Amino acid sequence: MIVEKILALRTCANNMADHCGLIWPMAGPVECKFWKPSGLHENGLTGLLWGKGVGAHLSAHADARWVVCEVAVDEMLQLAEEGMIKFPRATVLFVGNRSQALDYIAANMPLYGAALQLAAPAAPAHVHMPAAEPSAPATQATSATLPTPATPSTQATPSTQSTQSTQSTEATQSTEATPVATVAAAPPPPGQQHDVMAKKTETGVYGSTLTGADQSRLVAGYGSTETAGDHSDLIAGYGSTGTAGSDSSILAGYGSTQTAAGRSTLTAGYGSTQTAQEGSRLTSGYGSTATSGSDSAVISGYGSTQTAGSESSLTAGYGSTQTARKGSDITAGYGSTGTAGSDSALIAGYGSTQTAGSESSLTAGYGSTQTARKGSDVTAGYGSTGTAGADSTLIAGYGSTQTAGGESSLTAGYGSTQTARQGSDITAGYGSTGTAGADSTLIAGYGSTQTSGSDSSLTAGYGSTQTARKGSDITAGYGSTGTAGSDSSLIAGYGSTQTAGSESSLTAGYGSTQTAQQDSSLTTGYGSTSTAGHDSSLIAGYGSTQTAGYDSTLTAGYGSTQTAQQDSSLTTGYGSTSTAGADSTLIAGYGSTQTAGSDSSLTAGYGSTQTAREGSDVTAGYGSTGTAGADSTLIAGYGSTQTSGSDSSLTAGYGSTQTARKGSDVTAGYGSTGTAGADSTLIAGYGSTQTSGSDSSLTAGYGSTQTARKGSDVTAGYGSTGTAGADSTLIAGYGSTQTSGSDSSLTAGYGSTQTARKGSDVTAGYGSTGTAGADSTLIAGYGSTQTSGSDSSLTAGYGSTQTARKGSDITAGYGSTGTAGADSTLIAGYGSTQTSGSDSSLTAGYGSTQTAREGSDVTAGYGSTGTAGADSTLISGYGSTQTAGSDSSLTAGYGSTQTARKGSDVTAGYGSTGTAGADSTLIAGYGSTQTSGSDSSLTAGYGSTQTARKGSDMTAGYGSTGTAGADSTLIAGYGSTQTSGSDSSLTAGYGSTQTAREGSDVTAGYGSTGTAGADSTLIAGYGSTQTAGSDSSLTAGYGSTQTARQGSDVTAGYGSTGTAGADSTLIAGYGSTQTAGSDSSLTAGYGSTQTARQGSDITAGYGSTGTAGADSSLIAGYGSTQTAGYDSNLTAGYGSTQTAREDSSLTAGYGSTSTAGHDSSLIAGYGSTQTAGYNSILTTGYGSTQTAQESSSLTAGYGSTSTAGYDSTLTAGYGSTQTAGYKSTLTAGYGSNSTAGHESSLIAGYGSTQIAGYESTLTAGYGSSLTTQQNSSLTAGYGSTEIAGYASTLMAGYGSSQTAGYESTLTAGYGSTQMAEHSSSLTAGYGSTGIAGQDSSLIAGYGSSLTSGVRSFLTAGYGSNMIASYGSSLIAGHECTQIAGHKSMLIAGKGSFQTAGARSTLIGGAASVQTAGDRSKLIAGADSTQTAGDRSKLLAGRNSYLTAGDRSKLTAGDDSTLMAGDRSKLTAGKNSVLTAGANSRLIGSLGSTLSGGENSTLIFRCWDGERYTNLVVRTGEQGVESDIPYQVDDEGNLVGKADDDLVLDYDPGMILDGQCSPGTGEELRDV
């Protein structure tokens, strides 16, 4: 009994390595060097106790080794997994497969004391394994010991020491005849019921047949046949046939045939045929055929045919054919054909054909054809054709054709054709054609054609054609044509044509044409044409033409033409023309022309022309012309002209002209002119002119002029002029002037002037002036001054004193004193004192004192003091003091002090102080202080301080400070500070600081700071800082900083920074930074940074960075970076980077990068990169990369890469790569690759590759590859490859390949291959192959193959094959083959084959075969075959076959065969065969003599009268001596010819049947 020990089961890899890399022994102790007693699997050895538990950590590989080891109990740790233990060391007792290991544990458990404590049955233990591959068989050849449960002699016996194992003592007798070892199994131990499997190992020799039992290992030789039972391992030789049971592993040679049961592993050689069942894994060689059951994995070679059951995995080589059922996974090589059942996944190579069942996934290579049913997922390569069932997803490559069932999703490459049914989703590439059923979604590329059923959604690329039925949604690219059924929605690109059914929605791009029926909605781009049915909605772009049925809604862009019928609504852009039916609504843009039927509503933009019938509503923009029918309503913009029928309502903007008939209602804007018919109502804006018929009502704004006839009602605004006919009523605003006819009623606002005739009624507001005719009535407000003619009525305010001449009207306030001249009007406040000359008008507040000369007009606030010269006008606030010279006008706020000289005009706020020179104008806010020279004009806000010299004009906000020189103009915001020299103009926002020298013009926003030199112009946004030299012009946005020298012109956006030298021009976007030298011009977008030296011109987009030298010109897109030397010209797209030295010219697309030396010219497409030395010219397409040294010229298509040395010229197509040294000329088609040294000339077709040394000339067709050293000339057709050394000349047809050393000349036809060393000359026809050494000359016909060493001369006809070493001369007819060593000469007729060593001479007739060693001479007639060793001489007749060793001489007649050893001489007659050893001479014919050296074989061909026989004798045997001539006599005896005839008693060793026995000729040739 073994105590304190247990058995553990574990697995290792086939090389006995565990997962940590430790190599376990086949038997004996093993230990972990990094032991840690933790609960983790790391840092220790693991296994299952007694082989029971969860086997998740055991290997599932078929070739895994199952190890049983012995472990000490006290060193064992229990892990978390059921049955898993960990230990630091163990002793390996057994290695085998799974079943063997479990049998071993079950057999040996009774020997262990620890096992007796387990409550487990004695049956074998079982390991719960996950689903895995079948285990590999264990064989005697793969284990150190092969134990069985009952044979201690064949297994390691557990012991207390656990360190020893008993080796097998059974020996295997091995013999040559039977190389099979058999080990028999002993009976199992008592109590154990296990199947005992025979263990067998068989090794087969050449052509052997092997049959093995179960669990056998068979190794088979060439062409063997194997048959093995279960759990076998077979290794098969060439052409073998293997049949193995389940759980077998087979490795097969070339051309083998294999049949394996389930759970097998098969690896097959070239051309093998495999058949495997369930759970098999097959790997097959080239051209193999594999048939596998379910759960199989198949990997097949080139051209293989595979058939796999369900849940299989197939990987196929080139051109393979695959068939797989349910759950299969197929990966197919080039040109393969795959057919898979449901739940399959197929990945197919180029040109493959795939057919998959439901729920399959197909991925196909180029040109593949795919067919998939329900639930399939198809991804197709270029030109593929895909047909998928319902619930399929197809992604197709270029030019593919796809057909999918319902609920499919299709994505197609360029030029694809798609057909999909219900619920499909299609995304199509360029030029694709898509047809989809109901509920489909189509997205089509450029030029695609789409046809979709109901409830579809189509999105089409440029120029696409779309047709969709009910419920479709179409989005179309540029120039597309869309036709959609009812409930459709169409969005069309530029120039598209759309036709939609009822309830459709159309959105069209520029220039599109749309046709839609009932309930459609159209949105059209620029210049589009729309025709929509009833209940439609149209929105049209610029210049569009729209025609809509009734109940339509039209919105048109600029210049559009619209025609709509009943119940339509039109909104038109600028200059549009609209014609709408009854009940229509029109809104027209600027200059539009509208014509609407009855009950229409028109709204017109600026300058529009409107015509509307009965019940129309017209709203017209500025300068519009409106003509409306009866019951119309017109609202007209500024300067509009309106003509309206009866019962119309007109509302006109500023300066409008209105004409309205009976029952019209007119409302007129400023300066409008209104003419209204009877029963009209007119409301006129400021300065409007109104003329109204009888029973009209007029309401006029400020300064309006009104003329009204009988029964009119006029209400006039401030300063308005009203003339009303009989029975009129006038109400006039402040300062209005009213003239009224008889029986009129006038009511005037404050300060209004009223003139009324007989029977008039005048009511005047405060301070109004009323002049009334006879029978007039005047009511004067507080302190009003009234001058009234006879029979006038004056009403005076409280306490006023009124003095009026005849006909005057006086209204005086209480306590006021009024002295009025004749015809004067006095309005006096209470307690005021007024002294007025004749024709004066005095209005005084209470307690004020007014003194006025004749013709003066004084209006004084309470307690104010006013002194006015003649013809002066004073308006005083309360407590103010005013002193005015003659002809002056003073208006003062309360408490202000005003002093004005003659001819001044002063308006002062309360508490202000104003001092004005003669002829000055002062307007002062409260608390302001103003000092003005003569002829000045000052306007000051409250608290401001203004000081102005003679002739200045100042307008200041509150708290501002202004100092102005003579003849200056200052406008200051509140809190601003302005200092101006003479003849300057300053306009400042609040808080700004402005300093300007003489003759400057400054306009500043709030908080800005401006400093201007003389004769400068500054316009500053708020918070900006501007500093300008003399004669400069600065315009700055808010927060910008501008600094400019004299004569500069700066325009800056907000937050920008500009620094300009003298005579510079800067235009900066917001946030930009500009620095310019003198005489420069900078224009920058927002956020850009520009730096320019003198004389530069920069125009930059937003975010760009520009640095320019003197006299440079930069134009930059947004985000671009430009750096230019002096006298350069740069034009950059957005995001580009430009760097140029002096005198350069750069034009770059967006995102491009250009670096140019001086005197260079660069034109770059978007995303291109250009680097040029001085005096270079570069022109590149988008995405190209150009690098050129000085004086180079590069022209490149998009995506190309060019690198040129100085004085080079490169012209590249798109996607090409060019590299050239100095003074080179390269011209490349698209996709080509050219590399040239200096002074080279390269011309390349598209896709070609050229590499040239200096002073070379290369001309290549498309797709060709040329490589040359210096001074070479290469000319190649398309697809050719040329490699040449220096000073070489190569000319190649298309598809040819040429390689030449220096100073070589190669001329090749199309498809030929040429390789030559230096100083060689090759001329080859099409399809030929030429290889030449140095100083060689090769001339080859088409399809020939020539190989030559140095100094050789080869001339070959078409289809010939020549190989020559150096110094050889070969001349061959067509279809010949010549192989020669150095310094040999070969001449061959048509169809000959020649092979020669060095210094040999071969002359062969047609269809001859010659093979010679060194220094040989062979002369052969036609159809001869010669084989010679070195320095041999052979002379043969026709159809001879000669084989000789070194230094031999052979002479043969026709149809003879000679074979000789070294230094032999053979002479043969007709049809003789001679075979000799070394140093022998054989002569053979009918009755010929043969001589052989030592160990030679002599073959005699004899005729016995019935048939030929071959007699073979060997020297040294049976009395046949070496170097003795022999012959066969008539009796068939071998006769020696030494001295006398000697008849030998000879038993022939080999007699060959002469009746062409199979293999006879081949045997002789092999010998």
Curated annotation (Swiss-Prot):
It is found in: Cell outer membrane. The keyword Membrane applies. Residues 130-185, 283-296, 520-529 have a biased composition (Low complexity). Its main location: membrane. Keywords: Cell outer membrane, Ice nucleation, Membrane, Repeat. It is a peripheral membrane protein. It comes from the Bacteria. Residues 270-282, 302-325, 356-373, 449-469, 502-519, 594-613, 642-661, 689-709, 738-757, 785-805, 833-853, 929-949, 977-997 have a biased composition (Polar residues). The keyword Repeat applies. Pfam families: Ice_nucleation (PF00818). InterPro entries: Ice_nucleatn. Ice nucleation proteins enable bacteria to nucleate crystallization in supercooled water. Belongs to the bacterial ice nucleation protein family. This is Ice nucleation protein. The lineage of its organism: Bacteria, Pseudomonadati, Pseudomonadota, Gammaproteobacteria, Lysobacterales.
